[in-house]
Amino acid sequence: MPAAASHREQCERNVKAYDTLGGEQAAYFEWPVTTLFYTGVHLAEEYFARLSKPLHSSGHRQRLQCLADRAPEAAMKLAILHNASRLARYDCAFRAFKESDVLRLRDIAAKEIPRALQLDALTM
């Protein structure tokens, strides 16, 4: 099971990937949106690793359920990122995303999920 610091490092790498892909200015929103979801995934895993009895989820469903049991607001925010990622990649809804949508998703990943989990916010 990776340590909390490893999950934080992955979050920071995902932030760099988001920027490299163009962030909210990207020509192809599906990939920056996907990096935001995986940033949220690693925030959840960082939170789990910091628990007095650390745990590591085995998949998206289990992660959302474990999060809902412990931090329902964070689970709701992660579900928003998950749904956006799926819409952008699998439902070909990438055209539906506007810059303002991506900015909102960025705030969820960088500020709202960390706040709900009592973790340090991410700089994006």
Say what each PLM segment does:
Residues 1-124:
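Terminal alpha-helical segments
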